[in-house]
Amino acid sequence: MSRAASVSGDQMRRTLRWYDLVGLGIGGMVGAGVFVTTGHASRLLAGPSIVVSYAIAGLCALLSAFCYTEFAVHLPVAGGAFSYIRVTFGEFAAFITGANLIMDYVMSNAAVSRGFTAYLGTAIGVSSSKWRFVVSGLPNGFNEIDLVAVAVVLAVTFIICYGTRESSKVNMVLTALHIAFIVFVIVMGFWRGDPKNLTRPGKPEEHPSGFFPFGAAGVFNGAAMVYLSYIGYDAVSTMAEEVRDPVKDIPIGVSGSVAIVTVLYCLMAVSMSMLLPYDLIDPDAPFSGAFKGSDGWEWASNVVGIGASFGILTSLLVAMLGQARYMCVIGRSGVVPSWFSHIHPLTSTPVNSSAFLGIFTAALALFTDLNVLLNLVSIGTLFVFYMVANALIFSRYVQLGTTKPWPTLSFLCLFSITSLVFTLVWKLVPPGQPKAFMLVATAVAAIAVIQIFYCVVPQVREPELWGVPFMPWTPCVSIFLNVFLLGSLDGPSYVRFGFFSGVAVLVYVLYSVHASSDAEGDGSLGVKDVVHVLKESTETENAIHRV
């Protein structure tokens, strides 16, 4: 890792503290989640039970955050999931994961920037359709040109190229303003809202009633979509190389921001559902639309539009910081051109990665519809979190050259298969006693698999600084929830995921495997010892502190 870092030419400065990370985490998550995905998930998938969807997604994110935190504390370098998976499952798995995660970042940032156009229009009382124009001849979903979204992406790109500390200060200001608007929305929603809207649609003759109008399936489908809301904490972990005290600051920053944001999401979801029946919610601007539907409070929709605009800007800022650092570390490894890993000597930022991905994001935001982008994002995010949880278990129980990996790999495969069987039974088997029996039997089998592994296979690495509690139960629950939410997504999402993964495999075979910094002189790949790499990264961290 230290050898790879030298490719960048300069080190990133360690300037961030725990409060910076909490601010970056909150800023990165809240804007994208509440103001972009909530309307779609509530109107089309979950109804008022969207609050339960957020709670489930929040639990899943918190468990995944624990896994990220342990890795980030013991491997305090930029790169997040790519770095963690690279030192456990190897470069190929890391490349496929990293490629999908970067695509997730780019598409989610494009989606957020298009959401900014809708809320900015609400804030100043101008329909966003007046700022977008339709190009005939292009397919639906790709025929609305959004120049405002492009301008926002390019402006944020300039800010993150200027400096990380400066970006954090901008984020703190925007996040503080945003939180004030969030409190306004929550208070006004509970004050002006009608609890009957939690169970009664606006048009009961056309839409189902009740708090769970689409049943349990709708709750989990909604949870899968709003999981995009939590991608912000992952961006925080990518900045581990710029944190002053990773052991203390990263656990507080990552876990604290996820917990705070989950509470905010649930409160805002209840507030929105009380203000307006779910079938009358505007999918593109749900909170502004909810206040418009409240008699005498149309003015509040403009206030919400301003607050949402601040939130979307902070989300975009943090996510674009994260995507650039992923690309920087992937460039260090050599699997993509090392040009991407260049650190500017004056700003200490990965300027090439920031500029390239900023332009790529702007290009997608120019013409791609919000719904298309949201469906593309969720599956890749869930896959990456699933891989990190597996990698953490592997790193705790396997030391290459000392212990055999097959017992742990067999357990991970068997538990994933059991989780998949449970998911398929839940999704495909008709309701009834046979379904209940199969679900219970599968759950018992999954618990038995974990318990047998816990009793038979000893841990070979005990974390010295910070570790996930209740190993291997905590990451296993994370694995199960990620698999379950993956099963809630639609078929086209898997087609797109397969396409992107196929392209990534092709790039790896034709270029990356030969150019990698892991490649030996004969072109083969050397195998890294996990503990050795963790030790090497700690030595690098100490050297940076001495400088």
Segments from the language model and where they lie:
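Membrane-interface "cap" regions at the ends of multi-pass membrane proteins
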Residues: 1-39, 43-51, 61-66, 77-78, ...
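Extracellular loop-to-transmembrane helix junctions
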Residues: 12-13, 34-137, 257-263, 497-500
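Membrane-helix boundary/coupling elements in multi-pass transport proteins
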Residues: 38, 77, 100-118, 225, ...
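TM-loop-TM module centered on a large, flexible mid-protein loop between adjacent transmembrane helices
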Residues: 83-84, 89-90, 122-133, 205-214, ...
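Hydrophobic alpha-helical segments and their helix-loop junctions in multi-pass secondary transporters
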Residues: 118-125, 176-206, 269-276, 385-399, ...
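Loop-to-transmembrane helix boundary motifs in multi-pass membrane proteins
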Residues: 141-150, 244-265, 269, 277, ...
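Membrane-interface loop-to-helix entry segments
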Residues: 144-202, 254-258, 374-388, 404-411, ...
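A generic transmembrane alpha-helix motif of multi-pass inner-membrane proteins
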Residues: 409-547
